[in-house]
Amino acid sequence: AAGNHDYGYSNISVRRSNYNTYFPVDKNFKTQKIIREAGLNAEGVPTMENAAFEFTSPQGRKFLLLTLEFAPRDTIVAWAKNVTNQARYKDHTGIILTHSYLNSANQHIEKENYPITDGNYGAAIWRKLVQPSSNIQLVFSGHIGKPDDAREHVGFRTDKNAAGKKVNQMVFNAQAMGGGWYGNGGDGWLRILEFLPDGKTVKVKTFSPFFALSPATQQFAWRTAPYDEFEFQMDK
């Protein structure tokens, strides 16, 4: 999902972006098989900043995945709500990817100090889009962090949507690991989710191929703190 540094000259001073220049809707032939809609960016162009994808897992579970721009505008929240409410997706598991949503205290972000005034942050996205839905069950975000503090880069919470289904919400970032904001760019940390065949259990692990590459650092390749290695349950 597009983040604050994808807009304007620095830190979303305006809504203009080169995102569509480098990631146009028709660039990746593999996504052409699963993309269903592209919402309009601030300049009125359908782009990957706001897009809907549909796919089926190897176990047969149907997913609807939506990417949303940084601090999505009301028009985009309405677009996303319209997509998720379509009858053809009523039995899908909805996933939202956005940027600013949860903080490290596992709370929905209320507001941020950026020049734009037309955005919705975590609390508003939850209130306007996620909670009223009957099929959104997963929300993933990034954005947060503190130099060389793994705990301040992550968060997780579970609530219920209007249909009473669990909504598991996760934030994961790594950009200030490995020397701070201008250091090693996150040391390659990845969040791995394994969806088990029972259709409800998801295992979460945190891994760095950067550390795994060398015998001298392989022992640091897996982070195993409770906030980095855990399981959660989804509703079927």
Language model: regions and residue ranges:
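Active-site-proximal segments of metal-dependent phosphoesterases and phosphodiesterases across multiple
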Residues: 77-78, 87-137
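A general structural motif
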Residues: 61-63, 90-93, 136, 199-201
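Extended active-site neighborhood of metal-dependent phosphoesterases/phosphodiesterases
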Residues: 1-78, 89, 149-171, 191-192, ...
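Active-site glycine-centered loops adjacent to acidic/histidine catalytic or metal-binding residues
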Residues: 3-4, 99, 142-143
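Extracytoplasmic/secreted cell-surface and envelope-processing proteins
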Residues: 7-13, 75-77, 104-114, 148-151, ...
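A short C-terminal boundary segment appended to hydrolase-like catalytic domains
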Residues: 183-236
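A mature extracytoplasmic/lumenal domain signature
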Residues: 69-70, 100, 206-208
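Conserved beta-sheet core of the metallophosphoesterase superfamily
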Residues: 117-197
